[in-house]
A protein has these predicted regions:
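Detector for outer-membrane/organellar transmembrane beta-barrel domains
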Residues: 84, 181, 221-225, 247-364
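N-terminal periplasmic/intermembrane-space "pro-region" immediately following the signal or transit peptide
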Residues: 13-15, 19-66, 76
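Transmembrane beta-barrel strands of outer-membrane/channel proteins
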Residues: 51-57, 89-95, 127-129, 184-188, ...
């Protein structure tokens, strides 16, 4: 079983996988309304730039430890070329080293690069590398069909995983009306064919555009607080997958949400080992509630289910019978961002201005049902006007055949600084 931990380093690396404009316009409108009539209004800057630096101390399962250093540059551009056309670009460059004097390894990612055309008030057409995110859940998003193989961050934080990932090259057309919308996405194959989420994909196009696929979505307001979203997704050579997103207010402080996807598909184990002999209808879902407490504290409790995962005891049996094949399944699960077991649980807590102004706390615990696999993550972040300091702690527990026990490191401590421009 130690082979899984030895190969876990590559698995851990895999773990490292138009709405913003509307939000910005809304914020600008509110600020303008609150301003005095004679107060000048600053034009919104079309770009953002973050400079990151940090150090990480990790402890392996055998008791040895290692230190790593990282520097990163993350930029976004949202520029209006014409009244109805804008260009969106997002990119990230990282440099990592084992010591301060060692040679740095540089990696770069083009997260987004597309043109958006709005021919009318209710039509939008986008083309290029687009980072489309779907789903209402927090820890596991079954309907986020373009998530597979896209993550480029080593952080287990679900917010970071959804933000720091590769978009897929696609064309998207959207029609809007007062109470709903419908959109169609077409994403072509632009690299050698392989299944989405394959850990052996070694370049951006292989990770995101190795197969032809399309996605049709629609939403419609029902009542005052209900607006479900329906999805139909298909990859070339595979059966269509159907999805549903739903959330609603429960009282004044709680949001209840549900996310479901289903269709004919192989098990995770068969997919990872290129067998696909057990194709049948399988469901994946996430149900949860987010509650906002006084003092700006928010908690989320989420139950996760993966019909392609293994039942209780199967991970131990498969790991003992064929460690290499089971290691493949674990590697695929990280790239797919799917639980390994049939059921899992996720709890997330966040709080702002803890004890002092500008000090935020965030953390989660996730656990697989059926084994002792656990993962915990905690962050303290102090916000200033132009930068922030954060201290992160991460801990895994589990036997070598579990998805958390197979990771190469038992614990990590990170100290990070982020400069905002």
């Amino acid at each position: 079983m130690s082979a899984l931990r030895l190969t876990g380093l590559s698995i851990a690396a895999a773990l490292a996988c138009g709405h913003a404009v509307a939000a910005g316009q809304d914020d600008a409108a509110l600020a303008l309304a609150d301003a005095a009539p004679d107060a000048p209004v600053a034009a919104a800057r079309p770009w953002k730039l973050n400079v990151e630096g940090g150090a990480e101390r990790s402890e392996r399962w055998d008791g040895t430890s290692a230190t790593r250093y990282r520097a990163a540059l993350d930029g976004e551009l949202n520029y209006r070329l014409a009244p109805e056309v804008r260009a969106v670009v997002g990119a990230r460059i990282e440099r990592n080293a084992e010591t301060l004097t060692a040679e740095y390894r540089t990696r770069s990612y083009l997260k987004e690069a597309y043109l958006s055309w709005q021919p009318g008030a209710s039509q939008v057409v986008d083309a290029g590398r687009i980072n489309q995110r779907f789903g209402v859940a927090t820890g596991f998003n079954p309907t986020d069909f373009f998530r597979s193989g896209s993550v480029v961050t080593s952080s287990p934080d679900p917010v970071s995983r959804r933000t720091n990932r590769l978009g897929s090259v696609m064309v998207q057309a959207q029609q809007l009306w007062d109470s709903g919308s419908v959109s169609l996405l077409l994403s072509p194959r632009l690299a050698a064919r392989r299944e989405p989420g394959d850990p052996e994909a070694d370049d951006a196009l292989s990770k995101t555009n190795s197969i032809n696929r399309w996605l049709l979505t629609g939403s419609q307001q029902i009542g005052a607080t209900l607006r479900p979203q329906w999805l139909i997704y298909r990859e070339q050579g595979h059966s269509p997958q159907f999805g549903l997103n739903l959330n609603t207010l429960l009282g004044q402080s709680a949001i209840v949400y549900g996310e479901w996807a289903g269709g004919r598909a192989p098990s995770l184990y068969s997919l990872a080992n290129h067998q696909e002999q057990d194709v049948r209808f399988r469901s994946r879902s996430a149900l949860g509630v987010t509650y906002t407490w006084p003092l700006d504290i928010t908690t989320t409790f989420e139950w996760q289910a993966n019909g392609a995962g293994v039942a209780k005891g199967e991970d131990l049996a498969l790991g003992a019978r064929n460690p290499l094949a089971w290691g493949n399944a674990l590697g695929w699960s990280y790239n797919l961002q799917d639980p390994v077991t049939r059921q899992a649980f996720f709890t997330y807590v966040s709080a702002h201005n803890v004890l002092v102004q500008g000090l935020d706390l965030a953390g989660f615990v996730q656990a697989d049902r059926g084994n002792a696999g656990r993962q915990a993550w905690l962050e303290f972040r102090k916000r200033y006007d132009s930068f922030s300091l954060s201290l992160q702690w991460q801990r895994q527990r589990g036997e070598p055949w579990t998805r958390f026990g197979a990771l190469p490191e038992r614990s990590n401590v990170r100290l990070l600084v982020d400069l905002y421009y």
